[in-house]
Amino acid sequence: MVKIHLSRLLGEKRMSQRRLAEATGLRPNTINELYNERAKRIDFTTIERLCRALDCKVSDLFEYIPQRDEN
């Protein structure tokens, strides 16, 4: 699974979801899906916009967490 650290980053930057949407040009709904870790996919342009607006690296925003195979 991939963990999205958007809520933590917004808290650290004291930035609202609305302000991030305005800074990135992304739809508020898209920001909310990422914030609540409900997004099913994300494109490179979105990642680039988020990293630029948050002044962070991709590794600050996402974390890969291996899952145990439950077969």
Roles of regions detected by a PLM:
Residues 10, 21, 51:
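The alpha-helix within a helix-turn-helix
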Residues 7, 18, 48:
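Residues within the helices of the helix-turn-helix
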Residues 15-33:
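Short alpha-helical DNA-recognition segment
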Residues 33, 62-71:
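Short, charged recognition helix plus adjacent turn
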Residues 10, 35, 42, 65:
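DNA major-groove recognition helix of helix-turn-helix
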Residues 38-49:
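Short, basic-rich loop-to-helix N-cap that marks the start of a DNA-contacting helix
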Residues 1-15:
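A short, Lys/Arg-rich alpha-helix, primarily the initiator
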